[in-house]
């Protein structure tokens, strides 16, 4: 078999080439090196031919067969096919495109150099200017990184994360200064996609806020101080500008969901083991104990991605057979806690749905009064499903039905004006004074006084000053769960002045005999909703309002030894002294957000006992007032 040296001696036209000095990018099909139809091959290790420029020469040249001996004097033959005209054109085209790409890269480098020079000449703005504040709102995407961030490599994740840039990741870890500089550049250099542009109609597209960048891909996740950090590739930036970002900077990013889903599938075997172990531990913790270590705010802020990321981190430790114990233990405890939060989160969602349904039913009944909002930011309780919200009293068995008005005032006919304190209005006709201030419409009576409003027999219309209770509630309220153990309460979302009508005490009107029987059961539960209609203290009350199962917003108003509401008896259509309306008015100015309360023990007449209460048990007062009596009844 002839050698390559023999062929050179036979063919005098062949030229000996030194491929180490050959500039491949300048070769064309007409180059002398190609026309010579010669290829000199650098020999590497046994059975291998060194790659590089020589390979390009062989591909462009038309050498059909090359024979040579390797270092062990073994003959090696390489056969090459002649390139077609089509392939030659494609090679020339690719060379032109490469040249065009090099020009674009040089232009981009010049632009970046000019920007760096311009930034060096101008002072840096504070961090609050470069990026939006975290307290106000969590931005969708931010490039702000953790300070001095360098992921832990104790678990050996580099081989199992599926990161395309593992070498770059390791370089960034070994050179924290370079990493910090990269992040600084990433924050300060605006992304090309952030530039202002114009639509076809000429309108300007709003520019993205400074400090926000688009995530192209999340490459991997590591652990820094027991918290996950993510290696992020930014859109419009080279991989050298990748940064490590905390979860808070990426929580609203769509790429985060893709990353988590991808890694859940990758580690599904280990995650199944981990979740099984944690479920066993969770089953040993009663759900009633959850709220002792978990707040409602934490439940509302529950993010399922955070729990899934903990599963991924634990799975990576197992997949890498890491010897580290401290980090997996801490992350495992955090995952168990988040599983508790998840369990309470499901109960919280059901609770919010139930409260919303009750709120809708209540406000439909209350129309056209202002809406009442329902909220519970303390525990997972809901409104008792046995409670029925009503707008008017239910007349029980043995209670006479009130009749329509038999007499009314003639103020409008006599003076031609509305009812006033000086006119012979309903109040004066009943032996009381006019109840409301004509200018403000607020109550001007002292607690314990009776209110007589105009009725259907009066000559005045609905705009009369003496028609307040019958026109309904005019102020919005909030039904909320208290934090002092008093159950549900009512507060006002806006300030209320003294003498403002709040609501009427609504429920079932029953006889006192029936009330005594019900009162025994209510006392055992430490709650009572019985309200005696005993304005006429000269004799025992005949009837009682029971708001335990049927009632309105007044059902939830709590007791206070220093109340801001008082109960007034009010007559409108009928004058049966045994069946007054029980109405609440403010007795002092009330601030927005303050809880509404009244004295259950009739502070206006301490000598009158609460007849329907047994003495078998004492209920502790939780009002917290300075003059608190400590015992409710």
Curated annotation (Swiss-Prot):
Main subcellular location: nucleus
Binding locations of Zn(2+) 1: 409, 411, 419, 425-426
Residues that, per the record, bind Zn(2+) 4: 561, 621, 623, 628
Residue ranges constituting the Post-SET domain according to the UniProt record: 617-633
Record-annotated Pre-SET domain positions: 407-472
Residues binding Zn(2+) 3: 419, 454, 460, 464
Catalysed reactions listed for this entry: L-lysyl(9)-[histone H3] + 3 S-adenosyl-L-methionine = N(6),N(6),N(6)-trimethyl-L-lysyl(9)-[histone H3] + 3 S-adenosyl-L-homocysteine + 3 H(+)
Listed Pfam families: Chromo (PF00385), Pre-SET (PF05033), SET (PF00856)
Family matches, as InterPro entries: Chromo-like_dom_sf, Chromo/chromo_shadow_dom, Chromo_domain, Chromodomain_CS, H3-K9_MeTrfase_SUV39H1/2-like, H3K9_Histone-Lys_N-MTase, P-loop_NTPase, Post-SET_dom
Keyword Metal-binding: yes
Record's keyword annotation contains NAD: no
Binding residue positions for Zn(2+) 2: 409, 426, 454, 458
One GO BP annotation of this record: methylation
Domain Chromo span(s) in chain numbering: 213-271
Localization in the cell: Nucleus; Chromosome, Centromere
Alphabetized GO MF terms: histone H3K9 trimethyltransferase activity; histone methyltransferase activity; zinc ion binding
Domain SET: 475-601
Transmembrane spans: none
Keywords assigned by UniProt, alphabetized: Centromere, Chromatin regulator, Chromosome, Metal-binding, Methyltransferase, Nucleus, Repressor, S-adenosyl-L-methionine, Transcription, Transcription regulation, Transferase, Zinc
Sequence positions that bind S-adenosyl-L-methionine: 486-488, 529, 558-559
GO cellular component: chromosome, centromeric region; chromosome, telomeric region; nucleus
Entry note about domains: Although the SET domain contains the active site of enzymatic activity, both pre-SET and post-SET domains are required for methyltransferase activity. The SET domain also participates in stable binding to heterochromatin. In the pre-SET domain, Cys residues bind 3 zinc ions that are arranged in a triangular cluster; some of these Cys residues contribute to the binding of two zinc ions within the cluster.
Function according to Swiss-Prot or TrEMBL: Histone methyltransferase that specifically trimethylates 'Lys-9' of histone H3 using monomethylated H3 'Lys-9' as substrate. H3 'Lys-9' trimethylation represents a specific tag for epigenetic transcriptional repression by recruiting Su(var)205/HP1 to methylated histones. Mainly functions in heterochromatin regions, thereby playing a central role in the establishment of constitutive heterochromatin at pericentric regions. Involved in heterochromatic gene silencing including the modification of position-effect-variegation.
The protein's assembly and partners: Interacts with Su(var)205 and Su(var)3-7. Probably associates with HDAC1/Rpd3.
The family this protein is said to belong to: Belongs to the class V-like SAM-binding methyltransferase superfamily. Histone-lysine methyltransferase family. Suvar3-9 subfamily.
Name under which the protein is recorded: Histone-lysine N-methyltransferase Su(var)3-9
Encoding gene per record: Su(var)3-9
């Amino acid at each position: 078999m002839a050698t390559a040296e023999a062929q050179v001696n036979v063919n005098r036209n062949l030229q000996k080439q030194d491929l180490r000095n050959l500039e491949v990018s300048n070769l064309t099909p007409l180059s002398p090196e190609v026309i010579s139809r010669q290829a000199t091959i650098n020999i590497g290790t046994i059975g291998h031919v060194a790659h590089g420029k020589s390979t390009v020469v062989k591909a462009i040249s038309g050498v059909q067969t090359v024979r040579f001996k390797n270092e062990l004097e073994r003959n090696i033959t390489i056969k090459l096919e002649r390139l077609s005209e089509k392939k030659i054109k494609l090679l020339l085209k690719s060379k032109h495109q490469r040249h065009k790409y090099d020009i674009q890269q040089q232009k981009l480098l010049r632009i970046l150099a000019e920007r760096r020079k311009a930034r060096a000449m101008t002072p840096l703005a504070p961090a609050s200017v470069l990026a939006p504040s975290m307290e106000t709102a969590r931005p969708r995407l931010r490039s702000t990184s953790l300070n001095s961030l360098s992921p832990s490599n104790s678990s050996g994740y580099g081989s199992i994360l599926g990161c395309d840039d593992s070498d770059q990741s390791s370089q960034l870890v070994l050179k924290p200064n370079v990493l910090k500089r990269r992040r600084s550049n990433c924050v300060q250099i605006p992304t090309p996609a952030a530039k202002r542009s114009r639509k076809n109609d000429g309108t300007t597209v709003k520019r993205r806020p400074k400090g926000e960048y688009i995530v192209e891909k999340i490459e991997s996740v590591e652990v820094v101080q027991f918290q996950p950090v993510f290696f992020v590739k930014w859109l419009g930036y080279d991989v050298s500008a990748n940064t490590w970002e905390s979860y808070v900077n990426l929580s609203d990013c769509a790429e985060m969901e893709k990353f988590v889903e991808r890694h859940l599938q990758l580690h599904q075997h280990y995650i199944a083991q981990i979740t099984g172990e944690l479920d066993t531990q969770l089953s040993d913790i009663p759900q009633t104990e959850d709220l002792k270590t978990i707040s409602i705010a934490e439940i509302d802020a529950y993010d399922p991605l955070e729990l899934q990321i903990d599963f991924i981190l634990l799975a990576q430790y197992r997949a890498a057979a890491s010897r580290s114990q401290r980090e997996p233990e801490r992350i495992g405890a955090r995952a168990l806690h988040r599983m508790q939060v998840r369990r309470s989160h499901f109960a919280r969602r059901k609770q919010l749905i139930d409260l919303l349904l009750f709120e809708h039913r209540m406000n439909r009944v209350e129309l056209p009064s202002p809406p009442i909002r329902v909220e519970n930011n303390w525990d997972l309780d809901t409104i008792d499903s046995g409670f029925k919200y009503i707008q008017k009293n239910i007349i029980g068995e043995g209670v006479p039905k009130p009749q329509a008005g038999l007499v009314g005032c003639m103020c409008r006919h006599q003076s031609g004006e509305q009812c006033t304190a000086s006119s012979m209005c309903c109040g004066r006709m009943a032996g009381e004074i006019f109840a409301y201030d004509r200018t403000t419409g607020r109550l001007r009576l002292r607690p314990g006084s009776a209110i007589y409003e105009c009725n259907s027999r009066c000559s005045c219309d609905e705009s009369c000053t003496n028609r307040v209770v019958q026109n309904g509630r005019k102020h919005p309220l909030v039904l909320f769960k208290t934090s002092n153990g008093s159950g549900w309460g009512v507060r006002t979302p806006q300030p209320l002045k003294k003498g403002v009508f709040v609501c009427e005490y609504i429920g079932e009107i029953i006889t006192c005999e029936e009330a005594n029987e019900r009162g025994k059961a209510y006392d055992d539960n430490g709650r009572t909703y019985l309200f005696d209609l005993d304005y006429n203290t000269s004799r025992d009350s005949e009837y009682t309002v029971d708001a335990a199962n049927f009632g309105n917003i007044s059902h939830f108003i709590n007791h206070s030894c220093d109340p801001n509401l008082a109960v007034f008896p009010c007559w409108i259509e009928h004058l049966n002294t045994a069946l007054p309306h029980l109405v609440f008015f403010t007795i002092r100015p009330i601030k927005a957000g303050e809880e509404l309360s009244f004295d259950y023990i009739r502070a206006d007449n301490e000598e009158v006992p609460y007849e329907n209460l047994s003495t078998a048990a004492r209920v502790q007062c939780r009002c917290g007032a300075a003059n608190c009596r400590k015992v409710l009844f």
